[in-house]
């Protein structure tokens, strides 16, 4: 009977563990639902950003930066979705394994209960055999009567313990059924979340098509940027050449200005000499 009690305690502990796992599965399902909603919000955000890219294609540098950022976000979202799908598959596998172990333990408990019932039936059979046995010796009969009473007491105790074991087993079976129902509910939620993730995956594929078109446009603008860059380099080269030419011309202008100043000074000196000569001639 002690062995049965220990086994019943072990079954109760396993039942509690099954309930805990079911609650964990429910919490994980809720967490997965929140992640799916977040993924949908990210998809909507990506759609808005792609629209902004299409409306702001004239800003080539900003478009390239935003497109690269969106590609990185798309990769991260896709990796997160794949990781969530793998996690869901792993949780489903764990739940199935736990359910199989619970069913195996229930089967073992049922077999042991049948063995206990057979032992109780054997005790009852021995009690009946002792009741119908012919006893000739009074002292032996008294002793046998005492043994019979003790056997009856043990049989009654065995019956009570059997009834208690059966009642507890029924409670354990009911708890296991409820735990299995909760586990099935968790699996249903997981299936729903997988469907939501599939929809999110389709949305991501649509976004990838849109991004491929945007990338094609980006390549066209990148070609234009390269042409513009080449033209800019040529213009810069011409500007540098013109700047060097201007510097040379400026030096020539400075030289001519210096010569002009010198010629003015010479002219002034000659004028002064003529004035002086004229004054001298007039004085005479």
From Swiss-Prot:
Pfam families in alphabetical order: Tropomyosin
Residue runs in coiled coils: 1-284
Amino acid composition bias (Basic and acidic residues), ranges on this chain: 12-41
Residue span of region Disordered: 1-41
Keywords per UniProt: Coiled coil, Repeat
Keyword Coiled coil belongs to the record: yes
InterPro entries (alphabetical): Tropomyosin
UniProt comment concerning the protein's domains: The molecule is in a coiled coil structure that is formed by 2 polypeptide chains. The sequence exhibits a prominent seven-residues periodicity.
Subunit structure comment from the entry: Homodimer.
Function: Tropomyosin, in association with the troponin complex, plays a central role in the calcium dependent regulation of muscle contraction.
Name used for this protein in its record: Tropomyosin
Organism: Haemaphysalis longicornis
């Amino acid at each position: 009977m002690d062995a049965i009690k220990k086994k019943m305690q072990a079954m109760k502990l396993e039942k509690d563990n099954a309930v805990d796992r079911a609650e964990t599965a429910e919490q994980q399902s809720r967490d997965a639902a929140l992640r799916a909603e977040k993924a949908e919000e990210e998809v909507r955000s990506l759609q808005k950003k792609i629209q902004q890219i299409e409306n702001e294609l004239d800003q080539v540098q900003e478009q390239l930066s935003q497109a690269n950022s969106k590609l990185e976000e798309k990769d991260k979202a896709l990796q997160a979705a794949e990781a969530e799908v793998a996690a869901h598959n792993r949780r489903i596998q764990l739940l199935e394994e736990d359910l199989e172990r619970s069913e195996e333990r229930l089967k073992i408990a049922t077999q042991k209960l049948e063995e206990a019932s057979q032992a109780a039936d054997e005790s009852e059979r021995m009690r009946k055999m002792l009741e119908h046995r012919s006893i000739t010796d009074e002292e032996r009969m008294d002793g046998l009567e005492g043994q019979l009473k003790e056997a009856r007491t043990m049989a009654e105790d065995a019956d009570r313990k059997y009834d208690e074991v059966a009642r507890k087993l029924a409670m354990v079976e009911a708890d296991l059924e409820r735990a299995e129902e909760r586990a099935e509910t968790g699996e249903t939620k997981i299936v729903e979340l997988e469907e939501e993730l599939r929809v999110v995956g389709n949305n991501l594929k649509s976004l990838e098509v849109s991004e491929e078109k945007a990338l094609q446009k980006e390549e066209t603008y990148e070609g234009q940027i390269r042409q513009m860059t080449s033209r800019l380099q040529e213009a810069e080269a011409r500007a540098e050449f013109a700047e060097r030419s201007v510097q040379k011309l400026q030096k020539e202008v400075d030289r001519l200005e210096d010569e002009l100043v010198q010629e003015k000074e010479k002219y002034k000196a000659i004028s002064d000499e003529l004035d002086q000569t004229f004054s001298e001639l007039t004085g005479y």
